Amino acid sequence: ALIFATLSAAYIGEALE
């Protein structure tokens, strides 16, 4: 769950930028 949340946050952050 932790790794999934981290990857999701990184993916979303990159998409927003």
UniProtKB/Swiss-Prot annotation:
Q: How does it sit in the membrane?
A: Multi-pass membrane protein
Q: Quaternary state and partners of this protein? A: F-type ATPases have 2 components, CF(1) - the catalytic core - and CF(0) - the membrane proton channel. CF(1) has five subunits: alpha(3), beta(3), gamma(1), delta(1), epsilon(1). CF(0) has four main subunits: a, b, b' and c.
TM spans, by residue?
Answer: none
The answer to whether the entry has keyword Cytoplasm is no
Its family remark reads:
Belongs to the ATPase A chain family.
A GO CC annotation recorded here is: proton-transporting ATP synthase complex
Quote the function comment for this protein: Key component of the proton channel; it plays a direct role in the translocation of protons across the membrane.
Q: Where in the cell is it found?
A: Plastid, Chloroplast thylakoid membrane
Q: Report the protein name in the record.
A: ATP synthase subunit a, chloroplastic
Query: Which of UniProt's keywords are assigned here?
Result: ATP synthesis, CF(0), Chloroplast, Hydrogen ion transport, Ion transport, Membrane, Plastid, Thylakoid, Transmembrane, Transport
Domain of life of the organism in this record?
Eukaryota
Q: Which GO terms describe its biological process?
A: ATP biosynthetic process; proton transmembrane transport
